[in-house]
Amino acid sequence: SRGLGDVYKRQEKTLYNYIESGALSVKNIDLPKKVKYKVRSCSSSEAADLTIYEGRTYKDYQAFLKEFPDTRVTEMDTVLGCEGSKKVLLTLHFDCCSLMMAYLLDSKEVCHVKAIFDSIERSLGTFSFSSVFPLVLTDRGGEFRNPAALECGQENLIRTSIYYCDPMCSWQKPHCEKNHEYIRKICPKGTSFDDYSQEDITLMMSHINSSPRQSLGGMSPLKLAKLMLPSEVIDYLGLTEIPDDEIVLTPALLQK
């Protein structure tokens, strides 16, 4: 059916999970690859294992998109505070609409990144998570260096696929890097995130995502996202559309 084909194009291994869970009326025995596919554990022992990049390199990412060009891509990164600042921002950039969300992490560790993924999945459900985040491109920072923990969701179902830029090649995720410039207008380098709350960060992202972009034909990322992303995702993000004449993209926005 067309629905089955759509899921397959997004992510083959996610399709097998849907079949296994009974969401689709196909049996695993009809799919030989499923028998051979081993569900990976979410063990933290992989954190420093360079074999984690096998099948997840930037070249693999390009090959996947060449075969499935309509796949939604999310670029992921972190924004650091000043020296001595413990908290960091996890940023998720939806390439389809240029919307970026940021989450405050207690520290730059994979367990905190996983906690954000888990929270989103619990709210949206595994199927919706996989639909919205079928493919995530990030760098090789230590906070992302446990793909199994990020890819595995509830009941060990694969919820996404993680791919990595080449070493020292952050330019391979240009949309994320470009949007960080908006964050730096409000939180310049040297800013500590330790005194901010998630409410502060969400307010900042509401202003950033309400800002019209020439690259979007004068639309804002938030307006475009409302057309491109499921409504439950927009609701979950908790962003507020700010009128053009009230948008603040300076440090004054978060001054206590």
Residue ranges and their predicted role:
Residues 2-8:
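Short, small-residue-biased leader/transition segments that mark boundaries at the very start
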Residues 9-66:
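Basic, flexible linker segments flanking DNA-binding modules
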Residues 66, 79-101, 117:
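Short conserved beta-strand segments at catalytic cores or DNA/RNA-binding microdomains
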Residues 71-81:
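Two-metal-ion RNase H-like nuclease active-site motif
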Residues 81-85, 102-127:
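Active-site beta-loop-alpha junctions of metal-dependent nucleic acid enzymes
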Residues 138-140, 145-153, 162-186, 194-206:
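RNase H-like two-metal-ion nuclease catalytic core shared by retroviral integrases
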Residues 189-256:
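C-terminal domain-tail junction helix/linker
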